[in-house]
Amino acid sequence: MLTITKDNFEQEVLKSDKKVLVDFWASWCGPCRMLSPIIDEIAKETDKVKVGKVNVDEESDLATQFAVMSIP
């Protein structure tokens, strides 16, 4: 599982040769924790899509940039 930050977002997402599934999440979010195993399974089952996670508490600039108002 790829951890996406403001430092690697451009390289890992915008310049990726593959489609990218980005999961915006937070450790305090119960539904996010419920979805996490499903997101992890998607990442393991396919190599056609890159899967990454953005912790909205640690990367609030990215959450703001993409107008993430609530999660999940």
Language model region names:
Residues 30-33:
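Cys/His/Pro-rich metal-binding microdomains
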Residues 18, 24-28, 70:
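Short pre-active-site segment immediately N-terminal to redox-active cysteine/selenocysteine motifs
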Residues 63-71:
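Thiol/disulfide oxidoreductase modules built on the thioredoxin-like
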Residues 2-20, 60:
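A short beta-strand-turn-helix
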Residues 13, 36, 66:
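Short, flexible helix/strand-to-coil boundary loops that buttress conserved ligand/catalytic motifs
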Residues 3-5, 24, 36-61:
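Thiol-based oxidoreductase modules, predominantly thioredoxin-like and allied folds used
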